[in-house]
């Protein structure tokens, strides 16, 4: 798995889907999000209660969004 991708559940990042799923199941069925980088650029959302996987955006869209945000911050400084 690419190190830029992390699973996110309720403020916590996990390197593996299994860890994230276990945490989500113990956290009242919260969604597991596949994110790009340290930011909440969600690519996929997994709903443990319904076991449904939903695409939020593509990897390229997430990368472009992060790049735009980075460029905005550089311009402001």
Kindly label every feature range from the protein language model.
Residues 16, 58-60:
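Intrinsically disordered, low-complexity coil/linker segments enriched for acidic/polar
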Residues 53-55, 62:
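Repeat-associated, polar segments at repeat-unit boundaries in modular proteins
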Residues 1-4, 61, 68-77:
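Short intrinsically disordered terminal tails
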Residues 8-18:
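A short, exposed loop/beta-hairpin motif centered on an aromatic-Gly-Thr core
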Residues 2, 17, 42, 64-66:
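A subset of signal/propeptide-processing and intrinsically disordered low-complexity segments
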Residues 1-10, 26-51:
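Short aromatic-glycine-(Arg/Gly/Cys) micro-motifs in beta-strand/loop hairpins
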């Amino acid at each position: 798995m690419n190190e830029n991708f992390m699973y996110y559940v309720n403020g916590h990042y996990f390197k593996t889907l299994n860890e994230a799923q276990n945490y989500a199941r113990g956290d009242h069925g919260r969604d597991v999000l596949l994110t790009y980088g340290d930011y909440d650029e969600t690519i996929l959302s997994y709903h443990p209660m319904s076991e449904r996987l939903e695409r939020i955006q593509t990897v390229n869209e997430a990368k472009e969004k992060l790049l735009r945000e980075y460029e905005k911050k550089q311009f402001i400084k």
